[in-house]
Amino acid sequence: MKQFDPASSFGADVAARYDDALRGDEEAAAQFLCELAAGRRALEFAIGTGRIALPLAAHGVTVDGIELSPHMIERLRAKRGGDGIEVVQGDMSVTTTGRRYGLVYLVFNTIFNLLTADDQIRCFANAARHLDGAGCFVVETALPHAWIPSGQPDYVHAEQIGLDAVVLDVARYDPVTQLLEENHVRISTSGITMNPIVCRLITPGEMDLMARLAGLRLVERFANWQRTPFDAQSTAHVSLYALSDGVQPAGSALHAA
């Protein structure tokens, strides 16, 4: 998608509607992450409007964030408890907070928002840079095959159908570059709006290699926040990484064993 600016995907209009339809996994994610934090400070890459950070903070975890979009930060600040979360504006692949954490996490497919393999590797390296010796980096994404219909790299999906508006996801996937170009088109009685976004889809195996290049190792992988075992039928994954030369992360099942 020519002249695409990643920051434009989360402008004022998108930020204003971002929480209109929550995924429903917020509390499960917060409980999972709280166990891993084990009383230590946490850092969320791409904290957004605080969809996960605020429930996690409600569990007593001190949460910091890094966020590219000033509009998403503004929405977070306007929420109850949002002013208690320290946020640094910047690119999560390179921006630092000056602290180390027991938990760094990146959810809702957001690793895909980095559009080159090098940037995705830099994101893993930045997570490693922020971890303490027993810290854990958590990544949650869909599996690419769950997004791309078999043999259909171009598709249109009806995301919302209402009496006065419809929202369509118009997409094209390039398996060579692994880039998925999407435009979320809202057609309503008040007009038409478009919200473009480009993602670079990667598999769990690719993430594991990126982690190794960044000095991390895979500790555990689940199919969801409920710790369902990851298998061939899974459509998403929650993966836990630790420093290659670090101790087993606190709060992980292997540590508990």
Segments from the language model and where they lie:
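A short acidic, Gly/Pro-enriched loop at the edge of an enzyme's catalytic core
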Residues: V94-L103
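A short glycine-rich, Lys/Arg-flanked "PGG" loop and its adjoining helix->strand segment in the class I
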Residues: I121-G133
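Conserved class I S-adenosyl-L-methionine
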Residues: M1-G48
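C-terminal lobe and adjacent flexible extensions of AdoMet/dcAdoMet transferase-like proteins
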Residues: I202-A257
